Curated annotation (Swiss-Prot):
S-adenosyl-L-methionine binds at T74, D95, N123, A124. Pfam families: Ubie_methyltran. Methyltransferase required for the conversion of demethylmenaquinol (DMKH2) to menaquinol (MKH2) and the conversion of 2-polyprenyl-6-methoxy-1,4-benzoquinol (DDMQH2) to 2-polyprenyl-3-methyl-6-methoxy-1,4-benzoquinol (DMQH2). It comes from Shewanella sp. (strain ANA-3). Pathway: Quinol/quinone metabolism; menaquinone biosynthesis; menaquinol from 1,4-dihydroxy-2-naphthoate: step 2/2; Cofactor biosynthesis; ubiquinone biosynthesis. GO terms for biological process: aerobic respiration; menaquinone biosynthetic process; methylation. Belongs to the class I-like SAM-binding methyltransferase superfamily. MenG/UbiE family. Its EC number is 2.1.1.163, 2.1.1.201. This is Ubiquinone/menaquinone biosynthesis C-methyltransferase UbiE. It catalyses: a 2-demethylmenaquinol + S-adenosyl-L-methionine = a menaquinol + S-adenosyl-L-homocysteine + H(+); a 2-methoxy-6-(all-trans-polyprenyl)benzene-1,4-diol + S-adenosyl-L-methionine = a 5-methoxy-2-methyl-3-(all-trans-polyprenyl)benzene-1,4-diol + S-adenosyl-L-homocysteine + H(+). One of its GO terms (molecular function) is 2-methoxy-6-polyprenyl-1,4-benzoquinol methyltransferase activity.
Amino acid sequence: MSEGESKNTHFGYKTVEADKKADLVAGVFHSVAAKYDIMNDVMSFGIHRFWKRYTIEVSGARPGMKVLDLAGGTGDLTAKFSHLVGEKGEVVLADINDSMLKVGRTKLRDRGIVGNVSYVQANAEALPFPDNHFDIITIAFGLRNVTDKDAALRSMNRVLKPGGKLLVLEFSKPQHELMRKVYDLYSFKVLPKMGEIITKDADSYEYLAESIRMHPDQETLKQMMVDAGFEQVDYTNMTDGIVALHRGYKF
């Protein structure tokens, strides 16, 4: 690449300059933040709650631990972690998007979840935390929106304590042909219509469907985590692989 030439990446199916993607993604989430929780329930028929519950169950969170809920959005995981780590623990809800952080902060405070939760606007590619700081890091439905996923995984590895665990909950690739066909029909025909009706924004949900298709599949993401320094990496498919939970450890 010659000096001054821009590096390109994907924004959904579009090819864009890498340094423009973060702003484009920000526009999506500024647009949908206020109705984000409603859309999650509607578009997943509530199943996202079970995916997140399983993530919490396998996290091993205990009283006194420090947890980073990265791309934590409106705080579903943070709320659960806050209870598990207790008053001697700490949960950091970090998100690059200030609109999502505001919605999350308001929701959790309205539910009385205060004291052991802090809120940080942060880019996953360059996390503003000390080395070896967190016992657990989760990133749920956020990694596919990151411009440089490899840099983000390395950054997560840096701030994770030795013995700590990374959990990546993300849309992935259905395992059976019939499910793939049904999922494609739903994603590209039904989902944007839902977005248009509920949020007045079909384009953001077209991006959602496209970004899922451009995200690395299960085995590719597993290798990316290994390359970033994580060990004993494995994953569990849920709902036939529409979603996968990847786990990796730092030793």
